[in-house]
Amino acid sequence: MWYQGESDTSEAEGKVYLALLKKLIGLWRKDLRNENLPFIVVQICDLNNRADEGWRAIQCCQAKAETEIPQVKTVTSRDVCSHESIHPNDKRALALKTARAYFALTERAAEK
């Protein structure tokens, strides 16, 4: 699971984020000797409706990861945060969403 903030990002970093995320996932899968290792990306919620370009670019890349990298699911935390804090008030709800994403990946892999 990758659960990383975006508060210190720039638009330039957003342009390379997806490529770096692909590389990171690939390296972890190689190191763990499992090319199909399920990987969950958790998007941090919007902080006070923050909408700067760097933040949005990272969130966009995180959403694309699900379609561009095999065995990856993206989970958003927007619906479990208050928008006054990037940390969810209901951590259990986010944990359940993450678990569902993981099981969706592992069930799909088992069907192949």
Predicted stretch roles:
Residues M1-K112:
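Cell-envelope and extracellular/periplasmic
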